[in-house]
């Protein structure tokens, strides 16, 4: 990995069809505007099916009724998922009230889905409501630009740090990076906001005419919390503070979790440390990382196009030196930092400014009025009286931020009355799933609908072995693309087929180690049998403070993944 050129800087060969699509799209316009007026289908045609992703949307259908509709000779019930751009997950109560109303009035499912990319999604937007959703977002100062496809996606930022003044500084940087790396095309404004076409030619000085080779994810993280799971991301800025003031960042590049079942050219990878940079170089370095990946990333094979593969192909040192050259700096040695956890601190936490933050556990991030737990109504009622903001966390929870002492009791009463503060065990708080069925077209197995009952069973195992208040970081992802971040969990389930999963073990609590596959293509009873035995051993044999993942490695149950490019599949 330290050789100058383990592989070529640029991969020669026939470009993937996605590259043709981007090149011919006229800076992401395609024929989306014309397609919107085609009432014969609920979906988008041809290239537009993929181009709408650059505008923050995915075309989906309800897979629960797909076969039934096919039998009736009907096309699938097409509807769009829309993902908002929300750097750092901060949303005002005015914005919240607007999205609450849109979800209720204009989506099939009526829900707001908080995601582990620290934003919200609407599921089930019919084609006739696609333009109105963008206009609604714009009216409250939001957009969905660049939240999907080959761009820098929503920038994450630690939600509830131990030093709250650091959050304000780090959050400002998350916003600046997001804005700096946005596409410059006017396609979004023209298509969705009816802004006039301008005679000037579009230019993309950072992203280029064909944008990035693949999705690109960025974080700003404030130790000791690794709530944003930095090792799942392409570019990570670890905040370094002196006397409570942000002075610079450690840069880590090349994390990513997506794999393809059976494709040994794909693997999950933790990010590599490049070095420390003072604050004034932040945007130049961020741009240099992105443009290096733009120019060197593999455009012939999308399965091998992410930054992690570029680093492995050209060598970490070569990539780092190119970033230094483009940014005009030399990285200083990495400054010391450590992580102690990545879960959210559920409940009230007092900030340094004497205001309070209330973190609410939202199982799988799904905000809806459930029987006996009207969560969506409760949050709307809080939004009506709260003077501060809401923050969406990368664990799919919600923080009512900056609550003055005088409002605390009133907000707590509303939260309790609407089931937003029901007691849950630590295991549930540390479990997470992606959406998967029925809306995700890539889903191979259930995730969000499977996790609550599966967690019940894991809690029963913990109880049986006398450790009911312990927790294991547990994630379920419906397919190997890995949106549920199972590849950084202590127990990771990756969907293989309906009712079947690959079981990965050996990650750690702080999210710095990739888990290895322990058993392949097994059913829930098989998974529970394995976990029952191993959790029993952990309860008896663990050392003081030893997490489940660390125990499985120390006890020789699983070999740790040390160099994923070479040993992930062993």
From Swiss-Prot:
The keyword Amino-acid biosynthesis applies. GO terms for cellular component: sulfite reductase complex (NADPH). [4Fe-4S] cluster binds at residues 434, 440, 479, 483. Coiled coil: none annotated. GO terms for molecular function: 4 iron, 4 sulfur cluster binding; heme binding; metal ion binding; NADP binding; sulfite reductase (ferredoxin) activity; sulfite reductase (NADPH) activity. It catalyses: hydrogen sulfide + 3 NADP(+) + 3 H2O = sulfite + 3 NADPH + 4 H(+). SUPFAM superfamilies: Nitrite and sulphite reductase 4Fe-4S domain-like, Nitrite/Sulfite reductase N-terminal domain-like. One of its GO terms (biological process) is hydrogen sulfide biosynthetic process. The keyword Transmembrane helix does not apply. Binds 1 siroheme per subunit. Its EC number is 1.8.1.2. Its cofactor is siroheme; [4Fe-4S] cluster. Belongs to the nitrite and sulfite reductase 4Fe-4S domain family. This is Sulfite reductase [NADPH] hemoprotein beta-component.
């Amino acid at each position: 990995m330290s050789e100058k050129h383990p592989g070529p800087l640029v991969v020669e060969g026939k470009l993937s069809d996605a590259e043709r699509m981007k090149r011919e799209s006229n800076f992401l316009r395609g024929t989306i505007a014309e397609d919107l007026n085609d009432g014969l289908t609920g979906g988008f045609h041809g290239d537009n099916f993929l181009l709408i992703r650059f505008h923050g949307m995915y075309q989906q259908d309800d897979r629960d009724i797909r076969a039934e509709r096919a039998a009736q000779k009907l096309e699938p019930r097409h509807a769009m998922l829309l993902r908002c751009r929300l750097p750092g997950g901060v949303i005002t109560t005015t914005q919240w009230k607007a999205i609450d109303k849109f979800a209720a009035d204009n989506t099939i499912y009526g829900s707001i889905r908080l995601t582990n990319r620290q934003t919200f999604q609407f599921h089930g937007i019919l084609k006739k409501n696609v333009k109105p959703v963008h206009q609604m977002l714009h009216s409250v100062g939001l957009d969905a630009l660049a939240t999907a496809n080959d761009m820098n996606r929503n920038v994450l930022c630690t939600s509830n740090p131990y030093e709250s003044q650091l959050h304000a500084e780090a959050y400002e940087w998350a916003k600046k990076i997001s804005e700096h790396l946005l596409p410059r095309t006017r396609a979004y404004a023209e298509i969705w906001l009816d802004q006039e076409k301008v005679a000037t030619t579009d230019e993309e000085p950072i992203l280029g005419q064909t944008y990035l080779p693949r999705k690109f994810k960025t974080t700003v993280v404030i130790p000791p919390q690794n709530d944003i799971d930095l090792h799942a991301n392409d570019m990570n800025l670890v905040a370094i503070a002196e006397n409570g003031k942000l002075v610079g960042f450690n840069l880590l590049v090349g994390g990513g979790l997506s794999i393809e079942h059976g494709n040994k050219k794909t693997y999950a990878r933790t990010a590599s440390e490049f070095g420390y940079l003072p604050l004034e170089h932040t945007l130049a370095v961020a741009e240099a990382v992105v443009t290096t990946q733009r120019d060197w990333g593999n455009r012939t094979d999308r399965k091998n196009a992410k930054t992690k593969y570029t680093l492995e192909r050209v060598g970490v040192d070569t990539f780092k030196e190119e970033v230094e050259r483009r940014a005009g700096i030399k990285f200083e040695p990495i400054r010391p930092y450590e992580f102690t956890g990545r879960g959210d601190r559920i409940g009230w936490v007092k900030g340094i400014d004497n205001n309070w933050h209330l973190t609410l556990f939202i199982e799988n991030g799904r905000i809806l009025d459930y029987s006996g737990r009207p969560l969506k109504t409760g949050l709307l009622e809080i939004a009506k009286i709260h003077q501060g903001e809401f923050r969406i966390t990368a664990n799919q929870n919600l923080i009512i931020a900056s609550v003055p002492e005088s409002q605390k009791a009133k907000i707590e009463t509303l939260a309790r009355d609407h089931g937003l503060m029901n007691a849950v065990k630590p295991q549930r708080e540390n479990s997470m799933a992606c959406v998967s069925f029925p809306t995700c077209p890539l889903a191979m197995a259930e995730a969000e609908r499977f996790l609550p009952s599966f967690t019940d069973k894991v809690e029963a195992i913990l109880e049986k072995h006398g450790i009911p208040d312990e927790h294991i970081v547990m994630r379920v992802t419906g397919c190997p693309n890995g949106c549920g971040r199972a590849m950084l969990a202590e127990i990771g389930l990756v969907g293989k087929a309906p009712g079947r999963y690959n079981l990965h073990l050996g990650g750690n609590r702080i999210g710095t180690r990739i888990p290895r596959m322990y058993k392949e293509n097994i059913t829930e009873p098989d998974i529970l049998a394995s976990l029952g035995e191993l959790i029993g051993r952990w309860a008896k044999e663990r050392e003081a403070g030893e997490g489940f993942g660390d125990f499985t490695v120390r006890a020789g149950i699983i070999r740790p993944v040390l160099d994923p490019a070479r040993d992930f599949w062993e």
